[in-house]
Amino acid sequence: MSRIGKQPVKLASGLEAKLEGNKLIIKKGQDEKVIDTKGVVKVNINGDELTFEPVEETKFAKAMWGTVRALANNAVIGLTQGFEKKLEINGVGYRAQVKGNILELQLGYSHPINFEIPKGITITVEKNIITVKGSDKQQVGQVASEIRSFRKPEPYKGKGVKYVDEHIIRKAGKTAKK
């Protein structure tokens, strides 16, 4: 029995939901999110509330029950508030700037790194903080992870790109012989 799947999802004002075959479509104006129910989760639309239940008693259906509910909830939050991740750049000469739809990073390599910003994502840079915003939680996390992967923080001085709330475990350097 899924504890997450049992909980209903409230639709905020301005959102509309509809079913097309095995797909749940949540819409706000021109922006829409499509969630595939894989045919094993039944979605009930009652006014401004979505409820979910498995169609069959298989292990896969029970697993997808909570997953589909969580994806629908993330779609509602994404369309109303949006998601954001903040990254911090630490290091001498490390910097970032946005040029059109390209994020240009200088991270101590012999060349700048040009990262193309995907559709649906906005990136802003203030001093050494990169903010990644969007309505799709998975895409925001993926883009932030890709930016971090260009120069992960190293454990000795903490130089690199890290999440703002991430704690880097520091190591002591080598000690000199007597």
UniProtKB/Swiss-Prot annotation:
The keyword rRNA-binding applies. Keywords: Ribonucleoprotein, Ribosomal protein, RNA-binding, rRNA-binding. One of its GO terms (molecular function) is rRNA binding. InterPro entries: Ribosomal_uL6-like, Ribosomal_uL6-like_a/b-dom_sf, Ribosomal_uL6_a/b-dom, Ribosomal_uL6_bac-type, Ribosomal_uL6_CS. Pfam families: Ribosomal_L6 (PF00347). GO terms for cellular component: cytosolic large ribosomal subunit. The keyword Mitochondrion does not apply. GO terms for biological process: cytoplasmic translation. Belongs to the universal ribosomal protein uL6 family. This protein binds to the 23S rRNA, and is important in its secondary structure. It is located near the subunit interface in the base of the L7/L12 stalk, and near the tRNA binding site of the peptidyltransferase center. Part of the 50S ribosomal subunit. This is Large ribosomal subunit protein uL6. It comes from Nautilia profundicola (strain ATCC BAA-1463 / DSM 18972 / AmH). The gene is rplF.
